[in-house]
């Protein structure tokens, strides 16, 4: 599995409510997305950063989404291009499902 952490600077006019509204309106497009296990939206008012944490089944699944078009969409929507960092994610503890997921790396 791969975790991608996406961050982008937020303009001053995007407060917590506006960020939540923007995030909620984009959330449906991530449902049933090939290879996406889970997504968390991030908002840091103090540092003016937004973003997401994505858990993917594979790097190929992540790369299929993070296209130049997707990056342009994020830049237009939030006012800044995204910074994407990838991490191998060999083990996930999921207390909600009472499971430990281990990737055969």
What do the PLM-derived regions correspond to, one by one?
Residues 72-76:
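A common structural junction motif
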Residues 1-50, 59-68, 78-105:
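Short S/T/G/P-rich N-terminal loop/turn motif that feeds into the first structured element of a domain
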């Amino acid at each position: 599995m791969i975790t991608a952490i996406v961050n982008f600077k937020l303009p001053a006019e995007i407060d917590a409510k506006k960020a939540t509204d923007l995030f909620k309106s984009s959330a449906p497009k991530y449902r049933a997305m090939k290879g996406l296990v889970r997504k968390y939206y991030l908002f840091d008012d103090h540092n003016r950063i937004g973003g997401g944490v994505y858990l993917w089944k594979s790097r190929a699944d992540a790369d299929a989404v993070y296209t130049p078009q997707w990056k342009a969409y994020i830049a237009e929507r939030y006012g800044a291009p995204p910074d994407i960092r990838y991490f191998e994610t060999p083990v996930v503890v999921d207390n909600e499902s009472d499971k430990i997921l281990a990737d055969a790396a």
